[in-house]
């Protein structure tokens, strides 16, 4: 009887682990420039996370996640990104977790919208010992706006489990928000929020939802390099309590500008 009572809670904890701490990023609306590629390494370490195996998914406590993301601009407003996810967990060693592909399109500048607007669809597979979703689809509208030194980005994301032994195919709402301010010429300091509130057709108790706040730094002013790092605090029982993240990117132009 006790296991039956706990099953919905354990399912919620696994289901609502926002972004699974592999790719912790709030996207801006602009797509990668045509004829250029950015190589990004996402390095995340969970200082205080889940210590038990839950529904076949291995613990996140003291896990190191290294994700390679390669994004190429195809046209002036269309890009394709690919991901390779890896995991190093004490007691389990190094393993490749899975791979994703993510096409994204942005609104043309000719539309003269008051905000930046784009949309991505991310499809991928991952091993069942690292995720309750074997195949998943993420639909991500992206809205952003720059006011002088203040920057705001919204990613009201919907994640769909395509193949899973545990999760429904009903979309899960995962809102992400970034608010940053340019305190110095080449430095943005801000707050990033990552959440997962549950299936769109039913409400979850707050402790079964995932909510995390990251205090983040962004390097500005470089056309060739990208740097973001931050420390995240989990706000509910369903969220890893303390996570550090670093995103390091290098941009390459394949066609020389005249």
Model-derived features: where do they sit?
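Bacterial Sec-dependent N-terminal signal peptides
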Residues: 1-22
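Transmembrane beta-barrel domains of Gram-negative outer membranes and organellar outer membranes
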Residues: 18-258
């Amino acid at each position: 009887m006790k296991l039956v009572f706990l099953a919905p809670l354990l399912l919620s904890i696994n289901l609502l682990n926002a972004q699974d701490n592999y790719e912790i990023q709030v996207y801006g609306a602009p797509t990668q420039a045509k004829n250029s590629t950015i190589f990004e390494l996402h390095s995340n370490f969970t200082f205080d996370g889940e210590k038990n195996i839950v529904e076949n998914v291995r613990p996140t406590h003291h896990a190191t996640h290294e994700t390679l993301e390669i994004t190429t601009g195809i046209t002036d407003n269309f890009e394709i990104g690919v991901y390779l996810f890896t995991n190093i967990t004490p007691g389990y060693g190094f393993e490749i977790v899975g791979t994703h592909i993510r096409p994204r399109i942005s609104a043309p500048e000719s539309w003269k919208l008051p905000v930046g607007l784009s949309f991505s669809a991310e499809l991928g597979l991952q091993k069942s010992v690292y995720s309750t979703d074997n195949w998943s689809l993420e639909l991500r509208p992206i809205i952003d706006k720059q006011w002088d030194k203040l920057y705001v980005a919204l990613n009201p994301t919907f994640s769909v489990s395509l193949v899973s032994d545990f999760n429904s195919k009903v979309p899960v709402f995962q809102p992400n928000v970034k608010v940053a301010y340019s305190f110095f010429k080449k430095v943005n300091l801000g707050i990033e929020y990552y959440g997962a509130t549950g299936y769109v057709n039913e409400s979850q108790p707050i402790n079964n939802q995932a909510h995390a706040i990251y205090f983040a730094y962004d390097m500005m002013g470089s056309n060739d390099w990208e740097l973001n790092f931050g420390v995240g605090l989990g706000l509910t029982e369903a969220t890893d309590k303390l996570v550090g993240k670093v995103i390091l990117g290098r941009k390459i132009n394949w066609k020389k500008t005249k």
